[in-house]
A protein has these predicted regions:
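Short, glycine/charge-rich beta-strand/loop segments that flank catalytic centers
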Residues: 60-63, 108-113
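Short, amphipathic, aromatic/basic-enriched membrane-interface segments that mark the entry/exit
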Residues: 114-126
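N-terminal loops that bind phosphate or other acidic moieties
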Residues: 103-110, 130
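Conserved small/polar residues in nucleotide/adenosyl-binding loops
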Residues: 132-134
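Soluble N-terminal domains of membrane-associated systems
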Residues: 1-103
């Protein structure tokens, strides 16, 4: 990828790792993922990005991520939640692609950013109507 951040543990890279972990976790929690699944995804992304000693604490309303190897710690408030298992599935798919080195860390972050803004959410009335037609 043009302009990719080098694989050295630079300050910018550490910040990108933590931003990517937080974004993935935020999308998952806001979309109805279980806390343990969110934490697992965050720690896997960090480990695959070169931070095997990450620390993650997640509740239904917040995410805390840090690295034991440095003073990097970040938190994110999760003020709202809904059910959008498509987003949860897509975050997991992107995480697997990153683990298999099919995409780079900057690509993962970019795709998560697009996923956060471009994946449609549906109103409750529309979801109920679709359930009526599938039942």
């Amino acid at each position: 990828m043009k302009g990719a951040i080098p694989l050295v543990n630079s300050e910018k890279r550490k910040q990108l790792i933590i931003d990517t972990c937080i974004l993935a976790g935020k999308i998952m929690l806001e979309s109805g993922s279980e806390v343990y699944r969110t934490e697992d995804t965050i720690t896997r992304i960090a480990a695959n990005a070169g931070e095997p000693e990450s620390v993650c604490y997640t509740t239904a309303t917040g995410i805390f991520v840090g690295f034991r190897s440095s003073n990097y710690t970040q938190l994110e408030n999760i003020p709202q939640r809904s059910i959008n298992l498509e987003k949860v599935s897509l975050v997991n798919q992107l995480s697997r692609e990153f683990a298999q080195k099919e995409i780079t860390l900057p690509e993962l972050y970019q795709r998560l950013t697009l996923l956060e803004t471009d994946t449609p959410t549906f109103s409750i009335s529309l979801r109920l109507r679709s359930e009526e037609h599938t039942s």
